[in-house]
């Protein structure tokens, strides 16, 4: 679920950046998304959005699905082995790792999505 995703983000980035820094970043981070991603981090969010869309098509509710995971050496690892739980956990874990690797550009936080996306 979204609370677990927040914790995964903080696991992967070693707590160096708040999950709130990713809300309203670029064209895809936060609720919704459209247009062309502005950078690598925004592409991580687009991929995560697409993953959640795929989960929805499988009958899952990704924003609400509780799963089992652990943080080992700043790497989120899924423990869930069942359908929706495993799928959603993988979406979140891959996104958290992607966020941790991608450069964060302050100029892409709270951009005007009407003109830039």
Curated annotation (Swiss-Prot):
Tissue specificity field: Expressed by the venom gland.
Superkingdom per UniProt: Eukaryota
Coiled coil: none
Family according to the record: Belongs to the phospholipase A2 family. Group I subfamily. D49 sub-subfamily.
Protein name, per record: Basic phospholipase A2 pseudexin A chain
Location(s), subcellular: Secreted
A GO cellular-component term linked to this record: extracellular region
Predominant place of localization: secreted
GO MF, one annotated term: calcium ion binding
Function: PLA2 catalyzes the calcium-dependent hydrolysis of the 2-acyl groups in 3-sn-phosphoglycerides.
One Pfam entry name: Phospholip_A2_1
Cofactor notes: Binds 1 Ca(2+) ion.
Binding residue positions for Ca(2+): 28, 30, 32, 49
């Amino acid at each position: 679920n979204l609370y677990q995703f927040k914790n995964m983000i903080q696991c992967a980035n070693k707590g160096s950046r708040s999950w709130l820094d990713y809300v309203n970043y670029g064209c895809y981070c936060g609720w919704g998304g459209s247009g062309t991603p502005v950078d690598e981090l925004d592409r991580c969010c687009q991929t995560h959005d697409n993953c959640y869309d795929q989960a929805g098509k499988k009958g899952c509710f990704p924003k609400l699905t509780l799963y089992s995971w652990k943080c080992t050496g700043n790497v989120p690892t899924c423990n869930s082995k069942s359908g929706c739980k495993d799928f959603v956990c993988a979406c979140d874990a891959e996104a958290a790792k992607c966020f941790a690797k991608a450069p964060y550009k302050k100029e892409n936080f709270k951009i005007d999505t009407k003109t830039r996306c």
